[in-house]
Amino acid sequence: MSQDSVTFADVAVNFTKEEWTLLDPAQRNLYRDVMLENSRNLAFIDWATPCKTKDATPQPDILPKRTFPEANRVCLTSISSQHSTLREDWRCPKTEEPHRQGVNNVKPPAVAPEKDESPVSICEDHEMRNHSKPTCRLVPSQGDSIRQCILTRDSSIFKYNPVLNDSQKTHENNEDDGVLGWNIQWVPCGRKTELKSSTWTGSQNTVHHIRDEIDTGANRHQRNPFGKAFREDGSLRAHNTHGREKMYDFTQCENTSRNNSIHAMQMQLYTAETNKKDCQTGATSANAPNSGSHKSHCTGEKTHKCPECGRAFFYQSFLMRHMKIHTGEKPYECGKCGKAFRYSLHLNKHLRKHVVQKKPYECEECGKVIRESSKYTHIRSHTGEKPYKCKTCGKDFAKSSGLKKHLKTHKDEKPCE
């Protein structure tokens, strides 16, 4: 039993304008690539008029001159001038009917019946003016392609053997809307497939890439960190934000930070967590002299107590600083005015007054010596002037700090429920 030939109507997919608007860009690109693929392959094996003998059955054209309704047309790249340009270069001397040469300089095929069939529908006396290379083979795709075909050439006889899957033979055209019911297999994002690319092998051991399994939705460009895949390299570059998203890498605890401050904070947390683990496991602390104080801090026990008042501290240094209160020791003395202080911090704060206030202001009313910057604020205390007024309740204040403190009371007020 002979196999039926494949026409373009068997593999074409048509969308209405309404259906086309429902497709996303990825689906539109997939549709365009599949239709261009089918048109190229069918134009490759197409011929104008099949070679006829007295017993041969005329075969229909694979690419019929079909006109689609205006409502079902979809704007695609024109392929007729690129992939279907054929010319009458071949003639059979018995029938004197022209044969057109397909793309890539491959001679037009004729449909061959099975071995036990008769009559033979192949013209055996092809005398071609142009001789192609002796061997041409189209390797079929291993994925879900629309059709699989093997085109062979032996001397001057051409054979075309279409091979269709069972599921592919059940596709029927819906006459109501002019749309071919066709199931597209979508591959999930980041999932690997076993689909391979089809290739065209020439006689000079050259391999030309034909397709990348675009009819199954397989993505060629994949981004490993999150498993997200993209069909086009440009989409991958636009998506390539993982490298610049977080610049600072915290390698010890495998966290990432956006700036140095967070990085330093993570370092402190990591160190504290490590020290806590050392205390629980009994490991020796890196700071041996303070290992006892560190252990008491982790356990919450204050081991250093003041003999005078009984106050306890975590660290011995805190206890030594506290003891100065009981002894009355003030070792830090100002060299300009002779005033003594218990802590160096207080002395440094006192020295700023001598440096900044070279010419202090003395109030004429009360004789108080104040800084020049606080002169006008002090004068308002004598005049009673209150230039700062609350817009909510109308209360006046002599200092801006008093107004700011008052405004917080309005923010804390809750409306009546």
Curated annotation (Swiss-Prot):
Primary site of residence: nucleus
Keywords carried by this UniProt record: DNA-binding, Metal-binding, Nucleus, Repeat, Transcription, Transcription regulation, Zinc, Zinc-finger
One matching Pfam family: zf-H2C2_2
Any one Gene Ontology cellular component term annotated for this protein: extracellular exosome
InterPro entries: KRAB, KRAB_dom_sf, Znf_C2H2_sf, Znf_C2H2_type
Source organism superkingdom: Eukaryota
SUPFAM superfamilies the record matches: beta-beta-alpha zinc fingers, KRAB domain (Kruppel-associated box)
Zn finger intervals (C2H2-type): 304-326, 332-354, 361-382, 388-410
Record carries keyword Zinc: yes
Protein function: May be involved in transcriptional regulation.
Entry's family note: Belongs to the krueppel C2H2-type zinc-finger protein family.
Record's protein name: Zinc finger protein 114
